[in-house]
Amino acid sequence: MSKTRHDVFICPPLPHPVTTLTHELPDRHEIPRHLHPEHQLIYASRGVMSVWTGNGTWIVPPQRAVWIPAKTPHAITMYGAVSMRTLYVKPRLVRLSPNCRVVNVSPLLRELILHIVRLGMLEADNPAHGRLEDLLVDLLAAAETAPLELPLPADPRAAAFAERLLAEAGRSRFRK
């Protein structure tokens, strides 16, 4: 990752239409603020994540996924041990909302995510992978949004206060 102003890391572009990443992460693990040139679908088969952007925080419990549009700076915090499965999707494949959202993961979408993760990537010149891409695009377009967003206040004073609270939330005095 390359570092830019404001401590945002820019991840390098990935070579395939869909590329995956899998992590087993401990409680309170934090992934610092960064962005990707690809769209990102983050699914936790176990554990809870919170995803922060400049516009709000999305809570992502199991059986939900968060859609993060390409080039959206974000940070992620784990609550409990998390089994994270991520799909990085080239923007040319999917024309979804330009905003982050948490989606309900149907059993079919869950199995498709896990299958693509087992493959590691979907290659452009593989016809079977093309069919999986098409199914992924269709299922993402049909996925229902789950109301799990905590928007930041619009008032600048309230937003500054909320930012301070969020910055302090992970410190030990707030933990049990």
Q: Which role fits each region the language model picked out?
A:
Residues T57, K71-C100, V105:
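Ligand-binding loop in jelly-roll beta-barrel domains
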